[in-house]
Structure formats: C-alpha cells, structure tokens
Amino acid sequence: MGQRIDVNHENIYYGDFLAVEDVNINIEPNKVTAFIGPSGCGKSTVLRTLDRMHEIIPGAHVEGEVLLEGKNLYDKDVDPVAVRRDVGMVFQRPNPFPTMSIRENVLAGVRLNNHHLAKSDADDLVEWALRGANLWEEVKDRLDNPGIGLSGGQQQRLCIARAVAVHPQVLLMDEPCSALDPISTLAVEDLINELKSDYTIVIVTHNMQQAARIADYTAFFNLKAVGQPGHLEYFADTITMFNNPQNEEAERYISGRFG
C-alpha cells in the first residue's frame, strides 16, 4: 500500500540560492497528486526532494521536513539509497538502459540493490512488474530483445515496470507523457489510475487536461518574479482546483491568462 508524505516548511537551496521556499503539503496515500504551475516555479524541484534525487546536484540542500509515514527522509541516519527504494522515480523521457534486454531492464533496480534472485523468482518478478505496467501481453514473447527497441509509450511503461519491481511505496513521475503521442499518453494515464490502488503517486505535468483527468488532488506552484523563489500557491482537491479555485493566481493560470 502507498504511504503518506508530509512536507513541512521546506526550503530548497542550490548553494546559497533559495530556489523554493516554505512548502507545506500533505500528500494522501493511494491517491494521485498533480503538481502544476508555470515554468521555473519549482514543481519538479520539489518532486525531486521527495526521494532526495536533487542531491545529485552539488550544493543542493533542504531545510524543513519531508516525512514518509512520519519518518523524516532527511534525518542524518537515513540512507538516500534506501529512500529511493521506497520512493521510485519515472522521468520525463523514457530511459531504458540501451544495452539491456526488456527482462534485464525490469530487474536492473533490484540487482542494483544487491538482491540476488533465483531464475524462477526473477522470471516471476519480471512478469509481475510488466503486468503491473500493462506491458506483459505486448512483450512476453520477446523479453530478451533490447528495451530500446520498444515504442516510446512502451519504453515509458517499461520504466514504470522497472520502478515498481523494487516494491516502492511511492511513485514520482516528472512529466512522464511529455515525449509521448496521444495514444501512448492515454495508455500511461490509464495505468496511473490503476497503480494508485497500490502506490501513492505524485506527478508533475504542464498538461492541465491531464491533471484534471487523473489527479485526486492538485498543487499549484508559482513564483512572484523571475529570480525569486518558487512557492506553493494553492492546494486543493482537483475538482475544486479546476471548477471553483479559491485562489486568483490559480484561476488565472488554469484559464490560460498566464504561464
């Protein structure tokens, strides 16, 4: 089952530069939460702090708390690698490992975490993860073919299978459909709706229609001016956000008057 995330007074820095300030948000388990907002407002930056992925950038650091079921992911005794096992990430562009087969792509995260599996267990895990990503029937007869040979939409679902194979509690998705055609986009959206019964899902999207279709809750990020830190402007259930937002800036953004 998915787990709850609570972000309390989060400030995100790159060196001395304050990129995002004072984010407070409660992300419900087994729901889809969408992050929307204009370019540069910090939504992807906040997303990457939820699994400490931003730390690959030298000088990046966080003030405040990011709690997963009450445990602060930034406590000194917390291993970032362990965080990324519990919180999976699917990136903007499909990124299957180009030298690996479909099968090996699914198992890559498991083996990276030094888990040795018997062949029968590995086969079962590959089938389970690919079924979970709605890809099994399309690839079951060519598991040893290169993952890079799949279509764009299939590659993205393969990346989702790779993410779920390590049994995370949360799935983060950074514009997962931006490089896909409309048919592949709908396939991924259908998959997201199915996955939320097992995972907490947070998705960054520039597509307002997509957020309205798939999200249970929506967070609108904004920035006051170029060079100023981004911030969480407004958070609401998605029906309220798109039909009756109680925030003028959110209403202007959703209606296309800026952004």
Curated annotation (Swiss-Prot):
This is Phosphate import ATP-binding protein PstB. InterPro entries: AAA+_ATPase, ABC_transporter-like_ATP-bd, ABC_transporter-like_CS, P-loop_NTPase, PstB-like. It is a peripheral membrane protein. GO terms for molecular function: ATP binding; ATP hydrolysis activity; ATPase-coupled phosphate ion transmembrane transporter activity. The gene is pstB. Part of the ABC transporter complex PstSACB involved in phosphate import. Responsible for energy coupling to the transport system. It comes from Bifidobacterium longum (strain NCC 2705). It is found in: Cell membrane. SUPFAM superfamilies: P-loop containing nucleoside triphosphate hydrolases. It catalyses: phosphate(out) + ATP + H2O = ADP + 2 phosphate(in) + H(+).
